[in-house]
């Protein structure tokens, strides 16, 4: 089922799926340690970007950065991967656009690693599907995307470790439905993009399905007690309803 699949849209943090793809293409050793620099985190607070909480001088592994990128949607993780793998963010973004073109994402152009708004940073639902189909084939990506919680081991800056939690899997039991459960995904938001969501569900028969949505408007009424947002929760429940309908149809 496709609706408005070729309409131009701003992807917000769904961008970070491609950031992860390109990073994994360039990572030879997930356990290699790097040191977070000032340039990895500069400007992020001013841009109101979502971050994992990494600090300059902190030593973490490239695997830690992937979790920081995907679970809390950390722009600091995105920029650190770009700077340390490709030497600079612009160099990394060039690889992102090259990778997108190679995957057949013909209506996509990215200008940053994070999804922060830029008029020249755009894609389509159809291209996002191509991106996610490619990413999901990578075992390392699937492992990160389906993780609920992860703790970066203790550092000088975080003596008790840095605890990370998935923005999507936060809803935990709400992700289960009679025919299966939502096992992973990525959410995103900017005022210009609206609320965006990629989710993947596994049915009881083992088959997997994907739902992608974008441009959802903000809901003022609070639907969740803590964390997340009403609209993000609504997006997740809409996806759950679609998966439930698929499961019901399969059981007929």
Q: Where do the protein language model's features map onto the residues?
A:
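Active-site-adjacent loops and short helices of periplasmic peptidoglycan-processing enzymes
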Residues: 1-126, 135-136
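Penicillin-recognizing serine hydrolase domain
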Residues: 87-252
């Amino acid at each position: 089922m496709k609706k408005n699949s070729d309409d131009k849209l701003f992807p917000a943090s769904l961008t970070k799926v491609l950031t992860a793809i390109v990073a994994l293409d360039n990572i030879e050793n997930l356990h290699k340690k790097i040191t977070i620099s000032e340039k990895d985190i500069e400007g992020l607070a001013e841009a109101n970007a979502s971050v994992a909480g990494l600090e300059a001088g902190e030593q973490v592994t490239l695997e830690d950065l992937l979790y920081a990128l995907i679970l809390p949607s950390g722009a600091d993780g995105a920029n650190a991967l770009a700077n340390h793998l490709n030497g600079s963010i612009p160099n990394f973004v060039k690889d992102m656009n090259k990778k997108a073109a190679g995957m057949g994402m013909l209506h996509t152009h990215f200008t940053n690693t994070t999804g922060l708004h830029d008029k020249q940073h755009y894609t389509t639902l159809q291209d996002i599907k191509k991106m996610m189909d490619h990413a999901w084939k990578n075992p390392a990506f699937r492992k990160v995307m389906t993780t609920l919680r992860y703790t970066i081991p203790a550092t000088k800056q975080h003596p008790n470790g840095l605890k990370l939690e998935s923005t999507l899997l936060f809803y935990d039991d709400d992700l289960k439905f009679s025919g299966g459960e939502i096992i992973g995904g990525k959410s995103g938001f900017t005022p210009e993009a609206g609320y965006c969501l990629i989710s993947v569900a596994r049915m009881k028969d083992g088959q997997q399905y994907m739902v992608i949505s974008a441009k959802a408007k903000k809901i003022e009424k609070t639907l969740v007690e803590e964390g997340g947002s009403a609209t993000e929760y609504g997006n997740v429940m809409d996806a759950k309803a679609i998966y439930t309908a698929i499961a019901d149809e399969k059981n007929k």
